[in-house]
Amino acid sequence: FERPLPKSLFNGKAVLMGDAAHPMVPFLGQGGCLAIEDAYCLSSLIKKIKDLDQMVNVYDQMRNKRGRWIQKRSRLQGLFNHVSNPVLTPVRNIITKISMRSSVTKIHSYDLNEELSLKINSQL
């Protein structure tokens, strides 16, 4: 299941997190991880930025960018996983091995605390 991502994670009344903010196919196993990151990010921003509009704007910038990138990678991984043509399967295996290594490295080397510090300091 996949649906388009919202343009913004804040509609004036509610802040979206987790699957509501960035629904994706499960081929990278990141849906729950993003929900935890979202909650941590939002709670950290609430503590540090008192202006609501400014706080949700920073949250939206941070989480929308990462969510979109992971959603795109997960979709591509799903396409590669389902290639069944015997001629293309060896090529798929090589591409998947390379792309997965790159994606997993980028996903797991992300430092939310570092990004929060940079964003919060630039807002104050």
Where are these regions (language model features)?
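C-terminal auxiliary extensions adjacent to catalytic cores
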Residues: 93-124
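Long, charge-rich low-complexity segments
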Residues: 87-89
